[in-house]
């Protein structure tokens, strides 16, 4: 797919910011309009993160116009908003490939472009890295400018506050731009958000921004927005709030700041997520990341082949059903309400629902307090974000044996968001924690049973780990919403096919391809269900009449469930040849889930080939 550039009279002339900086200021508004249209046309045909980029068109143009990139450093926090940046930095002819295998990365990536100073994907990292770069520049006497662009959603994370506190004392030449659009992925939450001078509803973006700015003109007494007051009190020179969709206003203020050499700077910019496309302006949550869509009608394409419900919805339905009978169950999410399937729960049980913002560490220890008080906290969190709260899991939950249930979504391959978002490590980093039980459902019914089991488990924390996407393994487990629930006996696995010679020990949702392989090889197939504790009795029994073991998981081989089986076999002097199949020792790149599972040899054909090749050695 390619996009016809001849209808973009100015944009087609720009391959790098060098050409951009040769334009006169009176042409920049036309460039912004063309860039917005180009983004609309490209994402509607390719899919991708959408609303955030629409809101940063003018800011992106202004930054590359004023600053001498790539010598000067621009750092985009998270990176959802960086599509316009990619288009202006030599990648517009490849923008259609974004998030696809061998295509452009979803987020800024150092390996992709010299203009991408920091590889990102997780939130709130920009200020820390930017401060390090600014200090290094000063020590090398490079006269380089460093600019961090962070959204008001990302500013809720503790790491951002830690960096701001440090930057205010160092007095380095660092500019922090707050892209204040009243949103993260969902609506923002927290006192910082509610105290900022940002209106929750817009009718006309230009008039609303003027109202906000006119009512909050900055003065030396610091009586403006909470954000400006915060930064000013921490030693920053503050400017704003200003209209983030007025290109000339942005350029004027950025030039003034660039020519100032007195310590750290803060610029408060008001933007609107989805700006310039009415459907995205009206519903920026829906249009945060989109499939292909009809640009004229605003109708998103749907996958007509989807026959089963998603694991996220299974979790959300279970949470609602459980809350009907228990007002002490508390659902907690760190700013991932929609993705984790908690919309319905948040609406039906608002007093039992907490969105703690992008604050994974706080989410976990907050759940500890609830558990101590006799409540039943359920933390719904993506695998890749749970990494950010590792100490809290150990120190605040596991050591104290607190009954907190972790619903770990996006375990395994997540697809198009790539290496920063793959759930490749959770079984490895959780398995070594004492007092923790880990369950890996292979289908919809098992997922609900395990959530039910974890909810009733009172002797410590429990984890139910499931992947992104649909629960398609109903071939082995008939299931519907009326099927009764019960607690699974701890550690107990299930033999699904009795074969000979080879035993396949499956952990999680690779059960369906494993079943096909077991039939081909006449191997015994076991759904282990528990990564911790293992079904040691079953493993011992299998060693008595099998000559080889295969462990199978959608997690890093190193330290994963298969490693747990290896450890048990060695400790008990059960010397049976064992092949561990899982994710290899490198960061898994982007690509569709099915595509990446095939490439990694984790579909039926790939698993079969790995086993046969190993047997022949």
From Swiss-Prot:
Which residues does the annotation say bind Mg(2+)?
Answer: 152, 181
Enzyme class name: transferase
Task: Indicate yes or no for the key word Metal-binding.
Answer: yes
Q: How is the cofactor bound?
A: Binds 1 Mg(2+) ion per subunit. Binds 1 thiamine pyrophosphate per subunit.
- Name the residues that bind thiamine diphosphate: 80, 121-123, 153-154, 181, 277, 360
PROSITE patterns on file: TRANSKETOLASE_1, TRANSKETOLASE_2
Alphabetically, which GO biological process terms does the record hold?
Answer: 1-deoxy-D-xylulose 5-phosphate biosynthetic process; isopentenyl diphosphate biosynthetic process, methylerythritol 4-phosphate pathway; terpenoid biosynthetic process; thiamine biosynthetic process
Pfam hit, one? Transketolase_C
Gene3D superfamilies hit by this protein:
3.40.50.920, 3.40.50.970
Q: Which CDD domains match?
A: TPP_DXS, TPP_PYR_DXS_TK_like
Pathway in which the depicted protein is active: Metabolic intermediate biosynthesis; 1-deoxy-D-xylulose 5-phosphate biosynthesis; 1-deoxy-D-xylulose 5-phosphate from D-glyceraldehyde 3-phosphate and pyruvate: step 1/1
The terms describing its cellular component in GO are: cytosol
What Enzyme Commission number(s) apply to this enzyme?
A: 2.2.1.7
What Gene Ontology molecular function terms does this protein carry? 1-deoxy-D-xylulose-5-phosphate synthase activity; magnesium ion binding; thiamine pyrophosphate binding
**Obligatory cofactor(s):** Mg(2+); thiamine diphosphate
Against InterPro entries, the record matches this protein to: Dxylulose-5-P_synthase, THDP-binding, Transketo_C/PFOR_II, Transketolase-like_Pyr-bd, Transketolase_BS, Transketolase_C, Transketolase_CS
| Signal sequence segment | none
Keywords annotated in UniProt: Isoprene biosynthesis, Magnesium, Metal-binding, Thiamine biosynthesis, Thiamine pyrophosphate, Transferase
The protein's job, in short, is: Catalyzes the acyloin condensation reaction between C atoms 2 and 3 of pyruvate and glyceraldehyde 3-phosphate to yield 1-deoxy-D-xylulose-5-phosphate (DXP).
Give the family, as the similarity comment puts it: Belongs to the transketolase family. DXPS subfamily.
Quaternary state and interactors: Homodimer.
Q: What is this protein called?
A: 1-deoxy-D-xylulose-5-phosphate synthase
> From which source organism is this entry?
Blochmanniella floridana
């Amino acid at each position: 797919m390619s996009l016809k550039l001849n209808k973009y009279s100015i944009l087609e002339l720009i391959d790098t910011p060098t050409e951009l900086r040769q334009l006169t200021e009176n042409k920049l508004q036309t460039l912004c309009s063309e860039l917005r249209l180009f983004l609309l046309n490209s994402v509607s045909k390719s899919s991708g993160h959408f609303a955030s980029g629409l809101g940063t068109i003018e800011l992106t143009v202004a930054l590359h116009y004023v600053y001498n990139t790539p010598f000067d450093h621009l750092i985009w926090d998270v990176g959802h908003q960086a599509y316009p940046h990619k288009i202006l930095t030599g990648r517009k002819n490849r923008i259609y490939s974004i998030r696809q295998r061998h295509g452009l990365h979803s987020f800024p990536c150092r390996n992709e472009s010299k203009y991408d100073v920091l590889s990102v994907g997780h939130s709130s990292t920009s200020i820390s890295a930017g401060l390090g770069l600014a200090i290094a520049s000063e020590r090398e006497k490079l006269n380089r400018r460093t600019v961090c662009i962070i959204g008001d959603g990302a500013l809720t994370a503790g790491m951002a506050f830690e960096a701001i506190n440090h930057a205010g004392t160092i007095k380095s030449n660092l500019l922090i731009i707050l892209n204040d659009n009243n949103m993260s992925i969902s609506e923002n939450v927290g006192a910082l958000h509610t105290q900022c001078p940002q209106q929750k509803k817009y009718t006309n973006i230009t008039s609303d921004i003027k109202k906000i700015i006119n009512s909050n003109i900055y003065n030396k007494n610091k009586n403006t927005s909470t954000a400006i007051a915060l930064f000013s009190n921490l030693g920053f020179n503050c400017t704003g709030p200003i209209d983030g969709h007025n290109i000339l206003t942005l350029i004027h203020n950025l030039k003034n700041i660039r020519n100032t050499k007195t310590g750290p700077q803060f610029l408060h910019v008001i933007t609107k997520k989805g700006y310039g496309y009415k459907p995205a302006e009206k519903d920026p949550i829906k249009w945060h990341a989109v499939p292909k869509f009809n640009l004229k009608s605003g109708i998103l394409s749907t996958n007509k082949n989807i026959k089963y419900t998603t694991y996220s919805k299974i979790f959300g339905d279970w949470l609602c059903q459980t809350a009907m009978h228990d007002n002490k169950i508390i659902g907690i999410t760190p700013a991932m309400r929609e993705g984790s399937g908690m919309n319905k729960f948040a609406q039906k049980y608002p007093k039992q629902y907490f969105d703690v913002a992008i604050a994974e560490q706080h989410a976990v220890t907050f759940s500890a307090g609830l558990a101590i008080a006799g409540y039943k906290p359920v933390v719904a969190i993506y695998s890749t974000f749970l990494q950010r709260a590792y100490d809290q899991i150990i120190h605040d939950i596991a050591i104290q044996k607190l009954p907190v249930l972790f619903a770990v979504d996006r375990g395994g391959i997540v697809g198009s968001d790539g290496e920063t978002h793959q759930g490749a490590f959770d079984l490895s980093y959780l398995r070594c924690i004492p007092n923790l039980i880990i369950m890996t459902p292979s289908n919809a019914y098992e997922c609900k049973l395990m959530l039910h089991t974890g909810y009733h488990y009172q002797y410590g924390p429990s984890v139910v780990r499931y992947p992104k996407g649909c629960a398609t393994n109903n071939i082995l487990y008939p299931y519907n919403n009326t099927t009764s629930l019960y607690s699974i006996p701890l550690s107990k696995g299930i033999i699904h096919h009795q074969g000979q010679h080879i035993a396949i020990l499956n952990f999680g949702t690779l059960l369906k391809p494993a079943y096909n392989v077991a039939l081909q090889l006449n191997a015994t197939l076991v759904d282990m269900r528990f990564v911790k504790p293992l079904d040691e009795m079953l493993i011992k029994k299998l060693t008595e009449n099998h000559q080889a073991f295969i462990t199978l998981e959608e997690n890093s081989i190193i330290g994963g469930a298969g490693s747990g089986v290896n450890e048990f076999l060695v400790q008990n002097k059960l010397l049976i040849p064992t092949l561990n199949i899982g994710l290899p020792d490198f960061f898994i790149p982007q690509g569709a889930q099915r595509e990446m599972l095939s490439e990694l040899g984790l579909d039926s054909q790939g698993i079969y080939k790995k086993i046969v090749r190993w047997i022949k050695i």
